[in-house]
Amino acid sequence: MTKKVAIILANEFEDIEYSSPKEALENAGFNTVVIGDTANSEVFGKHGEKVTVDVGIAEAKPEDYDALLIPGGFSPDHLRGDTEGRYGTFAKYFTKNDVPTFAICHGPQILIDTDDLKGRTLTAVLNVRKDLSNAGAHVVDESVVVDNNIVTSRVPDDLDDFNREIVKQLQ
């Protein structure tokens, strides 16, 4: 059975941090499913990429997926603003159950809401690192960091390393 990767996404995502990992995963034979506020709605990247949401967060069941991808940009901030905290709850399933969880740039912000970062080693874009540290994570400045089931990366320049590692984690 082909593995499925959930991608949680909102407006103002960093286009390349969505499209590049998605392409790498699909080229490796994995299915990707975009999860957002409402199925069949559209979300737009910071540079104009338009993406149709496949499954609404209210209908999404984390146990249906083999991994979670959280692209950066301002999308994670919008997702954290969900008044019901559904995206943090969704991500918590992955972190608590040792299911592969991939986050780049601002993406690790969502992981703060899982309350599962204490003692974890992560990286992220510079202006998110203090928040991760305050949540109990050990933060390093490396292109890609693997801590058990969580893979994090900093910026678009790190995408080659990030993509290689997330595909490796699922093979």
Swiss-Prot record:
Signal peptide: none annotated. InterPro entries: C56_PfpI-like, Class_I_gatase-like, DJ-1/PfpI. Residues 3-171 form the PfpI endopeptidase domain. It comes from the Bacteria. Pfam families: DJ-1_PfpI (PF01965). PANTHER family: DJ-1 PROTEIN, DJ-1_THIJ_PFPI FAMILY PROTEIN. Belongs to the peptidase C56 family. This is Uncharacterized protein SAR1965. The lineage of its organism: Bacteria, Bacillati, Bacillota, Bacilli, Bacillales.
